[in-house]
Amino acid sequence: MGSKKSDLQDALVRYCIDRDGPGKEMYIFTNDEVKRLSMPIGFRNHNDATHIDTSHNLSPLMKKEGLGVIHLGTDRGVGNVARHAFIRNHEALFHEFEDISLENTTRQEYRPGPLDHLNTSEANILSMVNNHGILRGFLYPGDMRAIPQMYMAHRTRVRPRYRIGDINVPADLVQIEVDMTLEHEGSVTVFEAKNWKRGRGDFAIYQLYMPFRYYHQRMENGEIEVNNIECCYIVRRNMPGGSDIDVYLYTFEDPEDMASISLIKCKRYELRE
Protein backbone atom coordinates (compact mmCIF):
# COMPACT_ATOMS: atom_id res chain seq x y z
CA MET A 1 0.00 0.00 0.00
CA GLY A 2 1.43 3.38 -1.03
CA SER A 3 1.74 6.54 1.02
CA LYS A 4 -0.88 9.28 0.94
CA LYS A 5 1.55 11.44 -1.04
CA SER A 6 1.89 8.69 -3.64
CA ASP A 7 -1.89 8.22 -3.69
CA LEU A 8 -2.34 11.93 -4.37
CA GLN A 9 0.20 11.85 -7.20
CA ASP A 10 -1.66 8.93 -8.78
CA ALA A 11 -4.93 10.85 -8.41
CA LEU A 12 -3.36 13.85 -10.17
CA VAL A 13 -2.23 11.67 -13.06
CA ARG A 14 -5.70 10.16 -13.48
CA TYR A 15 -7.30 13.60 -13.26
CA CYS A 16 -5.04 15.08 -15.94
CA ILE A 17 -5.44 12.13 -18.32
CA ASP A 18 -9.23 12.15 -17.89
CA ARG A 19 -9.28 15.90 -18.53
CA ASP A 20 -6.85 16.17 -21.47
CA GLY A 21 -6.73 12.66 -22.92
CA PRO A 22 -4.04 9.96 -22.90
CA GLY A 23 -0.59 10.17 -24.45
CA LYS A 24 0.03 13.92 -24.08
CA GLU A 25 3.65 15.06 -23.67
CA MET A 26 2.61 17.64 -21.05
CA TYR A 27 -0.25 18.00 -18.57
CA ILE A 28 -0.52 21.35 -16.78
CA PHE A 29 -2.29 21.63 -13.42
CA THR A 30 -2.53 24.16 -10.61
CA ASN A 31 -2.00 24.24 -6.86
CA ASP A 32 -5.76 24.67 -6.43
CA GLU A 33 -6.36 21.38 -8.27
CA VAL A 34 -3.74 19.66 -6.12
CA LYS A 35 -5.42 20.96 -2.97
CA ARG A 36 -8.87 19.88 -4.13
CA LEU A 37 -7.72 16.34 -4.95
CA SER A 38 -5.77 16.07 -1.69
CA MET A 39 -8.79 16.60 0.55
CA PRO A 40 -10.54 13.19 0.10
CA ILE A 41 -7.16 11.43 0.33
CA GLY A 42 -6.29 13.16 3.60
CA PHE A 43 -2.85 14.38 2.52
CA ARG A 44 -2.63 17.73 4.27
CA ASN A 45 0.70 18.99 2.97
CA HIS A 46 -0.49 19.38 -0.61
CA ASN A 47 2.43 21.69 -1.45
CA ASP A 48 4.77 18.71 -0.97
CA ALA A 49 2.92 16.58 -3.54
CA THR A 50 4.92 18.03 -6.43
CA HIS A 51 8.29 17.84 -4.67
CA ILE A 52 10.10 14.76 -6.01
CA ASP A 53 13.89 14.89 -5.64
CA THR A 54 14.67 11.36 -6.86
CA SER A 55 12.97 8.98 -9.30
CA HIS A 56 12.68 6.47 -6.44
CA ASN A 57 9.84 8.64 -5.11
CA LEU A 58 7.73 8.66 -8.28
CA SER A 59 4.27 7.21 -7.70
CA PRO A 60 3.34 3.89 -9.37
CA LEU A 61 1.12 5.53 -11.99
CA MET A 62 3.74 8.18 -12.75
CA LYS A 63 6.26 5.41 -13.42
CA LYS A 64 3.77 3.49 -15.55
CA GLU A 65 2.97 6.58 -17.65
CA GLY A 66 6.60 7.76 -17.74
CA LEU A 67 5.70 11.09 -16.14
CA GLY A 68 7.73 13.44 -13.99
CA VAL A 69 6.87 16.82 -12.45
CA ILE A 70 8.27 20.28 -13.14
CA HIS A 71 7.30 23.59 -11.56
CA LEU A 72 5.98 26.30 -13.86
CA GLY A 73 5.72 28.95 -11.18
CA THR A 74 3.30 31.83 -10.80
CA ASP A 75 2.68 34.79 -13.08
CA ARG A 76 2.78 38.29 -11.63
CA GLY A 77 -0.45 39.60 -10.19
CA VAL A 78 -2.65 39.20 -7.14
CA GLY A 79 -4.58 35.95 -6.95
CA ASN A 80 -2.57 34.04 -9.54
CA VAL A 81 -2.06 30.38 -8.68
CA ALA A 82 1.16 28.39 -9.02
CA ARG A 83 1.20 25.91 -11.88
CA HIS A 84 2.99 22.61 -12.37
CA ALA A 85 3.26 20.13 -15.22
CA PHE A 86 3.61 16.43 -15.75
CA ILE A 87 6.23 15.83 -18.46
CA ARG A 88 6.23 12.55 -20.35
CA ASN A 89 9.78 11.16 -20.34
CA HIS A 90 10.64 11.34 -16.66
CA GLU A 91 14.11 9.95 -17.41
CA ALA A 92 15.06 13.39 -18.76
CA LEU A 93 14.24 14.96 -15.39
CA PHE A 94 16.63 12.85 -13.30
CA HIS A 95 20.36 12.21 -13.47
CA GLU A 96 21.93 9.01 -12.20
CA PHE A 97 24.96 9.43 -9.98
CA GLU A 98 28.14 8.34 -11.72
CA ASP A 99 30.28 5.58 -10.20
CA ILE A 100 33.37 6.92 -8.45
CA SER A 101 36.50 4.88 -9.15
CA LEU A 102 39.16 3.92 -6.61
CA GLU A 103 41.63 6.27 -8.30
CA ASN A 104 39.22 9.11 -7.58
CA THR A 105 38.86 8.12 -3.93
CA THR A 106 40.95 9.80 -1.24
CA ARG A 107 41.17 8.83 2.42
CA GLN A 108 41.64 11.88 4.59
CA GLU A 109 42.43 12.14 8.28
CA TYR A 110 39.47 13.66 10.00
CA ARG A 111 39.41 15.73 13.16
CA PRO A 112 35.71 16.43 13.57
CA GLY A 113 34.61 19.87 14.63
CA PRO A 114 32.26 20.07 17.63
CA LEU A 115 29.33 21.04 15.39
CA ASP A 116 29.98 18.71 12.42
CA HIS A 117 27.28 16.20 13.36
CA LEU A 118 25.01 18.44 15.40
CA ASN A 119 22.37 18.21 12.67
CA THR A 120 21.90 16.65 9.25
CA SER A 121 20.81 19.75 7.35
CA GLU A 122 22.07 20.60 3.88
CA ALA A 123 23.66 23.74 5.33
CA ASN A 124 25.57 21.62 7.85
CA ILE A 125 26.91 19.34 5.10
CA LEU A 126 28.17 22.32 3.12
CA SER A 127 29.70 23.91 6.21
CA MET A 128 31.53 20.70 7.08
CA VAL A 129 33.01 20.08 3.62
CA ASN A 130 34.08 23.71 3.39
CA ASN A 131 35.62 23.81 6.88
CA HIS A 132 37.69 20.69 6.19
CA GLY A 133 39.11 22.05 2.92
CA ILE A 134 37.31 19.63 0.62
CA LEU A 135 35.71 22.24 -1.60
CA ARG A 136 38.91 24.18 -2.21
CA GLY A 137 40.87 21.02 -2.98
CA PHE A 138 38.20 19.71 -5.35
CA LEU A 139 37.28 22.92 -7.17
CA TYR A 140 40.68 24.63 -7.25
CA PRO A 141 43.31 21.84 -7.20
CA GLY A 142 46.87 23.10 -7.02
CA ASP A 143 45.81 26.62 -6.06
CA MET A 144 46.52 26.75 -2.35
CA ARG A 145 45.92 30.51 -2.34
CA ALA A 146 42.38 30.26 -3.67
CA ILE A 147 40.01 32.14 -1.37
CA PRO A 148 36.59 32.00 -3.06
CA GLN A 149 33.83 34.40 -2.16
CA MET A 150 31.02 32.54 -0.36
CA TYR A 151 27.33 33.38 -0.61
CA MET A 152 25.02 31.47 1.70
CA ALA A 153 21.58 29.96 1.08
CA HIS A 154 18.86 32.17 -0.29
CA ARG A 155 15.58 32.00 -2.13
CA THR A 156 14.69 34.06 -5.15
CA ARG A 157 12.43 34.01 -8.20
CA VAL A 158 13.40 33.63 -11.83
CA ARG A 159 11.55 33.36 -15.11
CA PRO A 160 13.70 30.67 -16.74
CA ARG A 161 13.77 30.40 -20.52
CA TYR A 162 14.43 26.71 -21.09
CA ARG A 163 13.41 23.41 -22.56
CA ILE A 164 13.80 19.73 -21.70
CA GLY A 165 15.10 18.05 -24.83
CA ASP A 166 12.53 18.93 -27.50
CA ILE A 167 9.88 20.09 -25.01
CA ASN A 168 9.63 23.85 -24.55
CA VAL A 169 8.65 24.70 -20.98
CA PRO A 170 6.09 27.54 -20.50
CA ALA A 171 7.57 28.74 -17.21
CA ASP A 172 6.40 31.80 -15.30
CA LEU A 173 8.15 33.16 -12.20
CA VAL A 174 9.60 30.12 -10.43
CA GLN A 175 10.77 30.26 -6.82
CA ILE A 176 14.16 28.63 -6.44
CA GLU A 177 16.43 27.87 -3.52
CA VAL A 178 20.21 28.12 -3.79
CA ASP A 179 21.97 26.16 -1.03
CA MET A 180 25.29 27.97 -1.44
CA THR A 181 27.31 29.77 -4.11
CA LEU A 182 31.08 30.20 -4.48
CA GLU A 183 32.79 32.65 -6.84
CA HIS A 184 36.50 32.65 -7.68
CA GLU A 185 38.17 34.61 -10.48
CA GLY A 186 34.94 34.89 -12.47
CA SER A 187 33.91 31.25 -12.03
CA VAL A 188 30.64 30.61 -10.16
CA THR A 189 29.75 27.27 -8.54
CA VAL A 190 26.25 26.58 -7.19
CA PHE A 191 25.68 23.78 -4.68
CA GLU A 192 23.13 21.17 -3.69
CA ALA A 193 23.80 18.87 -0.74
CA LYS A 194 21.98 15.79 0.54
CA ASN A 195 22.42 13.02 3.06
CA TRP A 196 22.72 9.53 1.62
CA LYS A 197 19.52 7.49 1.62
CA ARG A 198 18.90 3.95 0.45
CA GLY A 199 17.34 4.04 -2.99
CA ARG A 200 18.66 7.51 -3.82
CA GLY A 201 20.59 6.59 -6.96
CA ASP A 202 19.78 9.75 -8.86
CA PHE A 203 18.63 13.31 -8.33
CA ALA A 204 16.15 15.74 -9.85
CA ILE A 205 18.15 17.86 -12.28
CA TYR A 206 16.12 20.98 -11.58
CA GLN A 207 17.84 21.21 -8.16
CA LEU A 208 21.02 22.24 -9.96
CA TYR A 209 19.59 23.63 -13.17
CA MET A 210 17.39 26.36 -11.71
CA PRO A 211 20.23 28.06 -9.75
CA PHE A 212 22.47 27.57 -12.82
CA ARG A 213 19.88 29.17 -15.10
CA TYR A 214 19.30 32.00 -12.64
CA TYR A 215 22.97 33.03 -12.72
CA HIS A 216 23.43 32.22 -16.41
CA GLN A 217 20.60 34.48 -17.51
CA ARG A 218 22.04 37.29 -15.38
CA MET A 219 25.44 36.69 -16.97
CA GLU A 220 23.89 36.77 -20.45
CA ASN A 221 22.12 40.03 -19.61
CA GLY A 222 25.34 41.62 -18.37
CA GLU A 223 24.02 41.92 -14.81
CA ILE A 224 26.97 40.06 -13.26
CA GLU A 225 30.61 40.08 -14.34
CA VAL A 226 31.41 36.36 -14.42
CA ASN A 227 32.48 34.06 -17.23
CA ASN A 228 31.64 30.52 -16.12
CA ILE A 229 28.94 28.76 -14.09
CA GLU A 230 29.16 25.19 -12.81
CA CYS A 231 27.12 23.05 -10.42
CA CYS A 232 28.27 20.89 -7.53
CA TYR A 233 26.22 18.10 -5.94
CA ILE A 234 27.43 16.69 -2.61
CA VAL A 235 26.27 13.52 -0.85
CA ARG A 236 27.31 12.74 2.73
CA ARG A 237 27.09 9.20 4.06
CA ASN A 238 27.79 8.49 7.73
CA MET A 239 30.33 5.71 8.19
CA PRO A 240 31.98 4.13 11.26
CA GLY A 241 34.58 6.64 12.43
CA GLY A 242 33.64 9.37 9.99
CA SER A 243 31.85 10.10 6.73
CA ASP A 244 32.11 9.44 3.02
CA ILE A 245 31.70 12.63 0.99
CA ASP A 246 30.87 12.18 -2.70
CA VAL A 247 31.38 15.35 -4.75
CA TYR A 248 30.15 15.74 -8.34
CA LEU A 249 30.81 18.74 -10.59
CA TYR A 250 28.47 19.31 -13.55
CA THR A 251 27.79 21.75 -16.33
CA PHE A 252 25.02 22.08 -18.92
CA GLU A 253 26.34 21.77 -22.47
CA ASP A 254 23.33 23.73 -23.75
CA PRO A 255 22.39 26.32 -21.10
CA GLU A 256 18.80 26.40 -22.37
CA ASP A 257 18.31 22.60 -22.17
CA MET A 258 17.90 21.06 -18.73
CA ALA A 259 18.53 17.60 -20.21
CA SER A 260 22.04 18.56 -21.37
CA ILE A 261 23.64 18.00 -17.94
CA SER A 262 27.20 16.70 -18.23
CA LEU A 263 29.73 15.52 -15.64
CA ILE A 264 33.01 17.42 -15.39
CA LYS A 265 34.56 15.36 -12.59
CA CYS A 266 33.73 13.52 -9.38
CA LYS A 267 35.60 12.40 -6.29
CA ARG A 268 35.02 10.58 -3.00
CA TYR A 269 36.58 11.73 0.25
CA GLU A 270 36.71 9.11 3.00
CA LEU A 271 36.97 11.10 6.21
CA ARG A 272 38.17 8.93 9.10
CA GLU A 273 39.17 9.80 12.65
List where the protein language model places each region.
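Nuclease-adjacent, charged terminal/linker segments that flank catalytic cores
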Residues: 1-119
